[in-house]
């Protein structure tokens, strides 16, 4: 098991927490001076922390399913192992018919850690250089419902 170092950048910041012992994601909490009313246009919401992530691991910010069900979106984001700045979550509403206000301490997203191999990109010059698979170029629902 890897350890992730967390620095609280603001006194009111909360350390990410698992909701249950088996939870994959850690809840991220808003750390803002005053409430923010979400709109359809994206807004950055501070989490008030910075991380030290070991190389070979990345962190992903993901939406919380309960908020998504209400049309409150947290944009996906990747935090690379070499990033040491403050974490923010991009949030927006699917429509303005259901106003939503974010307050400091609200759970706004999840943080999920993954092993990430470091890879190189090699340029090839024909489709045949990529090799063949059963699927080949089939996409966008080509494997069925």
PLM segments and residue spans:
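DUTPase catalytic domain/fold
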Residues: 1-145
